[in-house]
Every structure is written in structure tokens, then in C-alpha cells.
């Protein structure tokens, strides 16, 4: 099965998520075990488009081949991302330094198990530093950004039961905002509640 992706509206950030969900549904509903995702029509992508696809592809049991990726997708490390725990710290720092003057960081795939917490902290510090330098963020805003990222990633470590977490960010200076996407392929919020002994929540709507 060949899935040809549609381009998304760069004025509507949420359009990327719906486009990613559409692709995921096509793959899940297909009886084919071998599928191709064709990016030839893609000129613009957002973190909310790219990262859900990365997480899904890396966790999918089917054989998925990605074709016709543009230079931007190659530069951000689609589909496996940069894996800091698989390289020397100096190598990771050198890779990240290459992005210090860009408006984005590569997709970072980091260890998300509790026993790798120290590694996660070192990786997060590097990512935060690059984003702050890229945007020239003031110290008080930087503190808020670091707190937000730390809380989101700690939630993955503590509750998601996921082997890896992912983070990807792109800024849009002309539009005045920063788009950060953090994801995992864990047990979901509902699944986390169901692990509690006194849980009474049975469905997502609750």
C-alpha cells in the first residue's frame, strides 16, 4: 500500500495533527504488512505533524518505508531522530551546536525509563540551552520554558511506561511563536490511571 501525504495549511497548526491521525488510521486499517509513505507532495511540516508519525512508525509492527523526504525532513532526523544515549556526549553537543543559528532543533529521541533519569536531565539541559540561544529568550521566560519542558518530560518518565520519549521544536519568528511537540508511545493517560489501586476511571471521556 502506498500512502501519498497531503500538504498541510501552514496557518493552522492543528491541521498537522489531523493529517498525522489520518495517515495512522490508514495504516491501522490496512491489511497490508508492507506500506510506503510518500512525502513527495509535502512542502511544509509542523512538529505536530511530524512527531506523531515518528512515534507511530517506530512503534508499528508493520514494515513501513518512507520515500521522497525533502531536505528539511532529512535535516531534522526523520524518522529515527537523534539518539543522544547512543553516542558520546561530545558528539551530541557537536550535533546540537549545528542548530544554534537555526529556527528548529532535530527530533530528539531520549531514554524514558526511570533508571536513565540522569541521562534524560543532561539531554534536556542541552535542548533547552539551544532553544533559548536560538530565540534570544530573556531569563524569566527561559525559566518558564525550562520548567514546562521538565514537567512534560518527567510525566513521560514517571507515568507513560514508554522506553523512549521524543521532543521536536520549530520557531516561527515572523508569526511570533514557538511550536514544541513532546511525545511518547506509552500507556496513555487512561492507562496510567488504570495502574492505580483505587482507580475508578474506565474510559477516556471520564
Regions found by a protein language model. Give the residues of each.
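A conserved beta-strand-loop-helix scaffold within acyl/acetyltransferase catalytic domains
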Residues: 171-175, 186-187
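Conserved ATP-binding N-box helix of the HATPase_c
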Residues: 54-56, 139-173
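Amphipathic alpha-helical interaction surfaces in cytosolic regulatory modules
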Residues: 8-86
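Helix-loop-beta hinge of the Bergerat
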Residues: 103-137, 196-206
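A generic structural signal for beta-strand entry/edge sites
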Residues: 34, 175-179
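A contiguous, low-structure linker/loop signature
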Residues: 71-118
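Glycine-rich/acidic phosphate-handling loop/turn and adjacent ATP-lid/helix
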Residues: 180-206
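Signal for well-folded cores of large energy- and translation-related assemblies
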Residues: 132, 153, 157-161, 183, ...
Amino acid at each position: 500500500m502506498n500512502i501519498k501525504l497531503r500538504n498541510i495549511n501552514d496557518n493552522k497548526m492543528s491541521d498537522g495533527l489531523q493529517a498525522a491521525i489520518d495517515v495512522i488510521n490508514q495504516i491501522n486499517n490496512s491489511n497490508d504488512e508492507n506500506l510506503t509513505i510518500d512525502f513527495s507532495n509535502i512542502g511544509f511540516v509542523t512538529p505536530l505533524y511530524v512527531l506523531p508519525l515518528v512515534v507511530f512508525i517506530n512503534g508499528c509492527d508493520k514494515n513501513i518505508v518512507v520515500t521522497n523526504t525533502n531536505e528539511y525532513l532529512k535535516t531534522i532526523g526523520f524518522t529515527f531522530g537523534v539518539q543522544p544515549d547512543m553516542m558520546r556526549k561530545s558528539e551530541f553537543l557537536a550535533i546540537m551546536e549545528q542548530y544554534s543559528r537555526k529556527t528548529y532543533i532535530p527530533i530528539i529521541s531520549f531514554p524514558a525509563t526511570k533508571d536513565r533519569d540522569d541521562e534524560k536531565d543532561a539531554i534536556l539541559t542541552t535542548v533547552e540551552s539551544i532553544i533559548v540561544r536560538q530565540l534570544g529568550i530573556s531569563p524569566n521566560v527561559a525559566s518558564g520554558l525550562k520548567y514546562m519542558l521538565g514537567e512534560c518530560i518527567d510525566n513521560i518518565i514517571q507515568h507513560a511506561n514508554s522506553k523512549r520519549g521524543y521532543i521536536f521544536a520549530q520557531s516561527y519568528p515572523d508569526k511570533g511563536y514557538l511550536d514544541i511537540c513532546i511525545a511518547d508511545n506509552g500507556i496513555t493517560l487512561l492507562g496510567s490511571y488504570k495502574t492505580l489501586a483505587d482507580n475508578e476511571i474506565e474510559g477516556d471521556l471520564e
